[in-house]
Regions:
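Alpha-helical lid/collar subdomain of P-loop NTPases
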Residues: 165-170, 174-271
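AAA+ P-loop NTPase catalytic core and its hallmark functional loops
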Residues: 1-186, 190, 194
C-alpha cells in the first residue's frame, strides 16, 4: 500500500471478509494526510454513476441541462486516493470504464463532453477484493465474478491480507471493545479469538464452510456486553449463521475454548 502511495502504483488487496482490507488503506491514507474516497462496486453502480450525467438545473428561474461530473472524473483531477471496494462484484461495463485509468498516465476521455482529463499527479487508485479475479470457488462470495485478465494485468501490485496474528488481533479487538476492560474480560476475548482461529483452520481443512472474521469477534464482544451471556451472544452472532450439519463441529470448538457445552437445539430466542 505504501509503495502505491509513494510510487503511484495501482494496488489491489485481496483477502477473506473482515480482514480489514479497506480499513488498512484508509488508515494509511489518514496517516499520510491523503484524502481517501471509497466506492462500493455493487451491481447497481452504473457507468453513468461513475462518469456523470446530464442534470436539469435552475438558472435565473429557467431550467437548463448541465453535465454533472461523477466521482471518477472528480477523483482523477484531485489529490485523492480512490478505493474501489468489492472490485470483483462490479459489472463488466463498469469495469471497462475503470480500465481506462489503470495505467499510471492513463487519461480519462469523456466522449459526451469531448473532454480529455489528465490525472492529478497525486491521484492514487486502490481496489479490494475477496477473490483474485478468477471467480469464487468456495461458495462464500455469491455475486462475485471473474475479472477480465487484460484488466488484472494492469494492476501493478496484488497483495493478500490474511487474518492477523492472535496477539495483534487481540489489540485490535480490545481497542474496539472499550466497555470490556479488566483481566477477566481480556481472557474471554483471548478465547474468542482462539475460537475464531479454530474456525479458520477448520475452513481451510474443509471441515466447515463458514469462518469467523475479526469483525465477527468484535460483534460477539459487543453482543456479549448486551446479553451478559457467552453462549447466547455466540449463537446470535455466529452459530445461527452456520449450516445445521456443521453446528456440532463449531460447538466442539466452543467447548474446547471455554469448557462450556452448547445445546444445539437452542440457538437463541428471537425475542
Amino acid at each position: 500500500i505504501l509503495a502505491g502511495f509513494e510510487h503511484n502504483r495501482r494496488v489491489m488487496i485481496q483477502g477473506f471478509h473482515g480482514t480489514g482490507k479497506s480499513t488498512h488503506i484508509e488508515q494509511i491514507a489518514a496517516r499520510l494526510n491523503w484524502p481517501c474516497v471509497r466506492i462500493n462496486l455493487d451491481s447497481h453502480i452504473s457507468r453513468i454513476d461513475l462518469l456523470g450525467k446530464d442534470a436539469i438545473k435552475l438558472n435565473d428561474g429557467k431550467q437548463i441541462t448541465e453535465f454533472q461530473e461523477g466521482l471518477l472524473p472528480w477523483s482523477i483531477q484531485n489529490p485523492v486516493a480512490l478505493v474501489f471496494d468489492e472490485y470483483d462484484a462490479g459489472r463488466p461495463d463498469v469495469m471497462f470504464v475503470i480500465q481506462r485509468i489503470l495505467e499510471v498516465e492513463g487519461k480519462l476521455t469523456l466522449l459526451d463532453q469531448n473532454k480529455i482529463i489528465n490525472p492529478h499527479s497525486s491521484f492514487r487508485l486502490f481496489a479490494t477484493t475477496n477473490t483474485v479475479g478468477l471467480g469464487d470457488m468456495t461458495g462464500l462470495y455469491h455475486g462475485t465474478q471473474q475479472i477480465n485478465q487484460g484488466q488484472m494485468d494492469r494492476w501493478h501490485i496484488l497483495s493478500t491480507l490474511n487474518y492477523l496474528d492472535p496477539s495483534q488481533e487481540l489489540k485490535v479487538v480490545m481497542s474496539k471493545l472499550n466497555n470490556l476492560k479488566g483481566e477477566k474480560n481480556k481472557e474471554i476475548i483471548k478465547n474468542m479469538i482462539k475460537l475464531a482461529n479454530l474456525t479458520r483452520v477448520g475452513f481451510a481443512n474443509g471441515d466447515i464452510s463458514t469462518l469467523m472474521s475479526p469483525r465477527t469477534v468484535i460483534s460477539w464482544g459487543q453482543n456479549f456486553k448486551i446479553f451478559k451471556d457467552l453462549v447466547t451472544s455466540f449463537n446470535l452472532t455466529f452459530l445461527n449463521k452456520c449450516d445445521d450439519i456443521e453446528k456440532s463441529i463449531i460447538s466442539e470448538y466452543f467447548q474446547r475454548c471455554f469448557d462450556i457445552e452448547i445445546d444445539n437445539g437452542e440457538s437463541g430466542s428471537a425475542s
